[in-house]
């Protein structure tokens, strides 16, 4: 693919984060894909390519399959927020202890992605927005220091006039994801180059550059928030404070040994929170959070030259993307120009064709109780199904759109129809 303006470039950071989390945090992975799909559907038809359309159509089908194995609820935003705060806290603790490295920058960047996808649930609280900006800035600042051969400066900006705003690269307002990273873009290649170790020369990992002009004040402008490296303050919710998070041990940690344990959300937390059940207050597990060993990017070679697919996470037994120090996990996503596999077989392959319930006979008339009022969960599910139908129509997938519309109608009119299935 020679088009440098491929719209699908902006979706890859969210899809790559979803791949990393698929096994141990499928709910967060689902919302990463949902956010990517919603962004993708906003791409004007005139700007879409065959690659764009293929990714979006496959995303719709993948989300439908993922929903069957998940239990969605109105409180999912709290779970995603808690996970984002935990990832942020892990990077922040390592940075403030003076141990920041390229892995720390990648973890900060991943946290900024998780903070960003919270916007799909509604307005983001100011403290989360500040952490989002700080995480993105910190990723760039650490990367810049390593590139210049100096030790990253721990904690907040030394200069009060340092710009913490997120670099913008387009109408979406998100920072640039287009830098080349040979370790991450192999997800979406038709022909793959040998993977590169993430510990190679740092020039292989492109992060947003730190802005050179002063704008807003420092992130922590409250004196009470200028906490020392070893005793961070509690975050603005009941999620565990940084001092209960495991100390980072370097990029060689095995990712995802324990799933994230969600903690209830309260607006006014006590001063000191107990650690979550997966942590020990004295000997915390260093592996309870993922190590994000790649920086999302999109190089020219990452786009196929033929009509691609964005199928399941089990397209190939050897994943295209994995941590360099851990065994490959079957959670990668790939493009393929070969004929699609069967819809769903015992070896884990999933076809990108939609797997939907059989449609009722066209001769069957639809009857429903007009006095029935569906609950909020059913209305939310019906809205999602309707969105999928609109997305399918954008690719002339009429039959798929009809099935989603029928599902939406069923949720709104049938008391026995189940939400989240």
UniProtKB/Swiss-Prot annotation:
Keywords: Acetylation, Cytoplasm, Endosome, Membrane, Nucleus, Phosphoprotein, Plant defense, Protein transport, Transport. GO terms for molecular function: protein homodimerization activity. Its main location: cytoplasm. The gene is LIP5. Gene3D superfamilies: Immunoglobulin FC, subunit C, Vacuolar protein sorting-associated protein vta1. The lineage of its organism: Eukaryota, Viridiplantae, Streptophyta, Embryophyta, Tracheophyta. Induction: By Pseudomonas syringae pv. tomato strain DC3000 (PstDC3000). It comes from Arabidopsis thaliana (Mouse-ear cress). This is Protein HOMOLOG OF MAMMALIAN LYST-INTERACTING PROTEIN 5. It comes from the Eukaryota. GO terms for cellular component: cytoplasm; endosome membrane; multivesicular body; nucleus.
């Amino acid at each position: 693919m020679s088009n440098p303006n491929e719209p699908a470039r902006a979706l890859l950071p969210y899809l790559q984060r979803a791949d990393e989390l698929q096994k141990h945090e499928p709910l967060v992975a689902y919302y990463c894909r949902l956010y990517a799909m919603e962004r993708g559907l906003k791409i004007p038809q005139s700007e879409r390519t065959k690659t764009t359309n293929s990714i979006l159509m496959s995303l719709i089908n993948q989300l439908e399959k993922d929903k069957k194995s998940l239990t969605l609820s109105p409180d999912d935003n709290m779970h995603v927020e808690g996970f984002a705060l935990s990832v942020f806290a892990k990077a922040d603790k390592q940075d403030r202890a003076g141990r920041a490295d390229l892995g720390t920058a990648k973890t900060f960047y991943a946290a900024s992605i998780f903070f960003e996808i919270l916007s799909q649930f509604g307005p983001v609280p100011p403290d989360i927005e500040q952490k989002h900006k700080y995480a993105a800035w910190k990723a760039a600042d650490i990367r810049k220091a390593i590139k210049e051969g100096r030790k990253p400066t721990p904690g907040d900006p030394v200069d009060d006039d340092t710009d913490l705003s997120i670099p913008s690269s387009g109408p979406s307002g998100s920072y640039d994801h287009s830098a080349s990273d040979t370790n991450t873009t192999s997800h979406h290649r038709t022909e793959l180059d040998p993977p590169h170790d993430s510990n190679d020369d740092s020039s292989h990992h492109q992060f947003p550059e730190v802005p050179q002009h002063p704008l807003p004040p420092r992130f922590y402008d409250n004196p009470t928030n200028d906490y020392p490296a070893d005793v961070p303050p509690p975050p603005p919710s009941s999620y565990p404070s940084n001092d209960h998070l495991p100390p980072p041990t370097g990029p060689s940690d095995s990712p995802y040994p324990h799933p994230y344990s969600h903690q209830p959300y309260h607006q006014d937390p006590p001063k000191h929170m107990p650690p979550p059940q997966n942590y020990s207050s004295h000997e915390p597990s260093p592996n309870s959070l993922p190590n994000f060993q790649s920086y999302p990017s999109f190089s020219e070679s990452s786009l196929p030259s033929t009509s691609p697919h964005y199928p399941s996470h089990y397209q190939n037994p050897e994943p295209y993307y994995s941590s360099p120090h851990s065994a490959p996990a079957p959670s990668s996503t790939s493009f393929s120009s070969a004929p699609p596999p069967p819809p769903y077989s015992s070896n884990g392959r999933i076809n990108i064709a939609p797997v939907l319930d059989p449609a009722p006979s066209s001769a069957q008339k639809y009857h429903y109780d007009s006095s029935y009022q569906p609950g909020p969960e059913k209305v939310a599910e019906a809205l999602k199904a309707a969105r999928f139908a609109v997305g399918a129509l954008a690719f002339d997938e009429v039959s798929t759109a009809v099935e989603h519309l029928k599902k939406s109608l069923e949720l709104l009119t049938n008391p026995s129809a189940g939400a989240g299935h």
